[in-house]
């Protein structure tokens, strides 16, 4: 079974990239979709991602970091020309569904670039008091108007909404162009959801077919996330075809690389 990690970041520490590739090899992860969120998150920037992809073009898929309210549609176009295949969105200056941001979503739809939206509470390692960062701007239901206005746009809810699982699940169920990943730290929101049972939220037939595998952890935790995800699928007797969608088929379809 092919495995592609659809949610990974490149931290700005020595040898992180080589450690990441080694962790991917250990877990039989074929490729990962990688973004750099810059100094605020102790990551490399988009230029650093470009350089990483040049080193490992067959292992890395570039996701350009776009901050709504700071970056523009032209930045998306430039990234597309540079070979980026998808977009990573977080910490907007206004809610995701603000009309001022619609040119971003229109450009992404035109270029057929899937968007991975952070949803829920956000952890920022570097505190900047002048920054007004609000998780309320990143509520999963902020994506509803976007999914309606741009029906050909491919949206991924990161972290299943973190603490807004009810809303994330309903959007997932009701909108054909919305998917989710279950990424996050082992001791974070995933632990709560698994203690209850994720079928509380993914209750309808075919719900698991809209999941995309992603980790969003440091390289040393990737194997743990993968094992937890497989254990969860085993618990609910998820069939092999659905597993193929989760671990590679969905993201490849969204990237139009099937």
Give the residues covered by each predicted segment.
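Mid-to-C-terminal alpha-helical segments outside catalytic/metal-binding sites
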Residues: 1-9, 15-31, 35, 77-78, ...
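Active-site neighborhood of phospho(di)ester-bond hydrolases with catalytic His/Asp-centered motifs
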Residues: 3-6, 33-36, 63-64, 88, ...
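Active-site gating/metal-coordination segments in enzymes
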Residues: 39, 43-132, 136-137, 178, ...
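Conserved, mostly hydrophobic/aromatic
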Residues: 7, 24, 49, 79, ...
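Catalytic pocket-lining loop regions of alpha/beta-barrel enzymes
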Residues: 86, 101-212
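Short, acidic/polar
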Residues: 13-24, 44, 68-79, 165, ...
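Short active-site segment of divalent metal-dependent hydrolases/proteases
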Residues: 10-11, 121, 162, 219
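A generic "structured core" feature
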Residues: 2-4, 104, 116, 146-149, ...
């Amino acid at each position: 079974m092919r495995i592609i990690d659809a949610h990974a970041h490149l931290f700005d520490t020595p040898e992180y990239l080589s450690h990441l590739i080694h962790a991917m090899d250990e877990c039989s992860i074929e490729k990962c979709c990688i973004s750099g969120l810059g100094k605020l998150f102790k990551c490399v920037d988009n230029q650093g991602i470009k350089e990483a992809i040049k080193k490992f073009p067959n292992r890395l898929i570039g996701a350009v970091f776009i901050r709504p309210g700071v970056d523009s549609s032209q930045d998306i176009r430039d990234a597309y020309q540079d070979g980026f295949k998808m977009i990573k969105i977080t910490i907007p200056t206004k809610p995701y569904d603000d009309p001022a941001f619609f040119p971003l979503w229109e450009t992404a739809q035109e270029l057929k670039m899937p968007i991975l939206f952070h949803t829920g509470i956000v952890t920022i390692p570097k505190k900047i008091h002048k920054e007004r960062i609000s998780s309320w701007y990143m509520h999963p239901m902020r994506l509803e108007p976007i999914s309606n206005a741009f029906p050909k746009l491919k949206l991924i809810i990161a972290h299943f909404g973190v603490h807004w699982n009810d809303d994330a699940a309903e959007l997932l169920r009701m909108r054909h162009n919305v998917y989710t990943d279950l990424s996050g730290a082992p001791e974070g929101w995933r632990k709560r959801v698994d203690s209850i049972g994720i079928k509380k939220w993914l209750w309808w037939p075919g719900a698991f077919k809209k999941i995309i595998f992603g980790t969003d952890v440091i390289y040393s935790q990737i194997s743990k996330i993968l094992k937890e995800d497989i254990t969860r699928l085993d618990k609910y007797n998820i069939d092999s075809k659905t597993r193929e969608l989760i671990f590679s088929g969905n993201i490849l379809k969204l990237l139009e690389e099937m």
